[in-house]
Amino acid sequence: MLDKLTTELRNEKTMNLDEMNTIEILTAMNEEDHRVPQQIAQALPAIAPLVEETIKAMKQGGRLIYVGAGTSGRLGVLDAAECPPTFGVAPDRVIGLIAGGEKAFIEAKEGAEDDEGLGEADLKKIQLTVRDVVVGIAASGRTPYVIGALKYANQVGAVTGSLACNRGAAISRIATYPIEVETGSEVLTGSTRLKAGTAQKLVLNMISTTVMIGLGKAYKNLMVDLKPTNEKLRERSKRIIMEATDVEAAVAEKHLREAGGVVKVAIITILTGCSVDQAQMTLDRNGGFIRKAVHELN
């Protein structure tokens, strides 16, 4: 089976990898990495409908759930973990499941990915519903853990998407919204943490970021729903308010403090002159979109 996967083929350009010097190895890797964005560009028409369905689902209270094993699982967990601080969503709105559980994130758990039943069981643990979106991630496109999860998600009636790095992947036949980014042979044969992993990371960035923009988490190109939980983020929050409203630092800081640290509310109060309570109510009424709230108040 593996010999039919392009991700497992030997790369003809690196047959003498062990004889290359440092700069030659780095050059070979860099040249191969350049192929990844080109392949993703071809997959954009497949990525878009999954994003749009995810926006619809999350507006109705659904969750985005990534499922994967090994590198694929770790990338899903990583993308999910970045959403709360970046976009201000609750940790249970974007979830990453990895075969073998949390410990498998830092230490490989042998055999976990080979059990379809574990994929189903992990989704049952988080009480998957018809409102959710499940995205199965597998470079090979044939990981049993992911297949089991997608099959169960289909049974429940959840939206299903998949991300594979081989054409004609098994998970593509199961998911309603399949994405295939054919990254080809790796510099180091079969090491899919390289180009395949890079492609997966870029696509997951696209999915989560575009979904969050569709949920009102951006104003212009500013990250307005971040949570200022440390000094760096507090400074970033202040700078975002300054950029959005063209005010001085002291004014931004004052409005941020009065808004209880809620960047969106601070921006609306500055742009419209309304009270904090009025800004929050109008923002809520407009689904969290600053632009719509400001338009209503003005």
Swiss-Prot record:
Record bears the keyword Hydrolase: no
Swiss-Prot/TrEMBL keywords: Carbohydrate metabolism, Lyase
Catalytic center residues: 82, 113
E.C. designation(s): 4.2.1.126
GO molecular function: carbohydrate derivative binding; carbon-oxygen lyase activity; ether hydrolase activity
UniProt domain SIS: residue ranges: 54-217
GO BP, one annotated term: amino sugar catabolic process
Pathway(s) the chain acts in: Amino-sugar metabolism; N-acetylmuramate degradation
Gene3D superfamilies: 1.10.8.1080, Glucose-6-phosphate isomerase like protein, domain 1
Signal peptide: none
Reaction catalysis annotation: N-acetyl-D-muramate 6-phosphate + H2O = N-acetyl-D-glucosamine 6-phosphate + (R)-lactate
Source species, domain of life: Bacteria
Enzyme class of the recorded protein, top EC level: lyase
Known role: Specifically catalyzes the cleavage of the D-lactyl ether substituent of MurNAc 6-phosphate, producing GlcNAc 6-phosphate and D-lactate.
Family: Belongs to the GCKR-like family. MurNAc-6-P etherase subfamily.
Quaternary data: Homodimer.
Protein name: N-acetylmuramic acid 6-phosphate etherase
Lineage: Bacteria, Bacillati, Bacillota, Bacilli, Bacillales
